[in-house]
């Protein structure tokens, strides 16, 4: 996959070994709730959050991501969002080569203060592990965000530059046009560490990266 510079990025082991310096002790994570722990929230704090809230609220921390050091609670999905996410997940895995795999709603630990949870990502198959709670950017070839009303600013403005800076070579943003998906396809320019728009796809998605893809957007599986 595309990387920036000549130095090799950190390995999975390097990223995992950084966990202790990127997290607080489990008992301290919610000690100051609703304020963050001393030093602010870190990417590995998300692994230490309980499922239920500090006052027993069920599934309070079930859908949360870390964006620039702030906890972001994600709203329930609308049917359009769930349908497109599932359909693309199926189609991408049908067409992917053996060395690549599509995953849905898995965290990406980009650095100490960033752990977003994109709707879909294409990763190296050899990096997949049922015990992981996140993937590092070095194994990610494509990130897909499906825009919802509450996530418009994050998906359009906040997240893409960070994905690009971390060297993720491909980014798709999916918009809802009268309950039909419109896919904006971006490719990384390694010279500037920024994305450039390479196409807007209505009805049919046909691209060559991160692998040859041809999907009828009107015929996504439910």
Language-model features, listed with the residues they occupy:
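Gly/Pro/Ser/Thr-rich low-complexity, intrinsically disordered segments predominantly at protein N-termini
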Residues: 2-222
């Amino acid at each position: 996959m595309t990387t920036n510079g000549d130095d090799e990025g950190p390995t999975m082991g390097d990223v995992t070994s950084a966990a202790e310096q990127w997290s607080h002790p489990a008992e301290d994570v919610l000690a100051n709730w609703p304020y963050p722990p001393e030093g602010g929230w870190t990417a590995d704090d998300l692994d230490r959050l309980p499922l239920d809230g500090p006052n027993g609220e069920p599934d309070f921390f079930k859908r949360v991501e870390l964006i620039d050091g702030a906890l972001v609670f994600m709203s329930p999905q609308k049917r359009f969002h769930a349908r497109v996410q599932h359909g693309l997940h199926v189609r991408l895995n049908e067409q992917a080569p053996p060395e690549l795999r599509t995953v849905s709603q898995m965290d990406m630990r980009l650095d100490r203060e960033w752990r977003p949870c994109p709707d879909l990502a294409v990763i190296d198959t050899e990096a997949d592990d049922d015990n992981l709670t996140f993937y590092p950017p070095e194994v990610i070839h494509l990130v897909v965000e499906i825009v919802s009303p509450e996530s418009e600013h994050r998906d359009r403005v906040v997240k893409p530059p960070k994905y690009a800076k971390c060297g993720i070579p491909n980014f798709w943003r999916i918009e809802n046009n009268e309950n039909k998906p419109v896919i904006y396809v971006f490719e990384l320019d390694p010279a500037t560490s920024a994305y450039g728009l390479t196409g807007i796809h209505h009805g049919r998605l046909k691209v060559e990266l991160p692998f040859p893809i041809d999907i009828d957007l009107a015929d996504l599986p439910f």
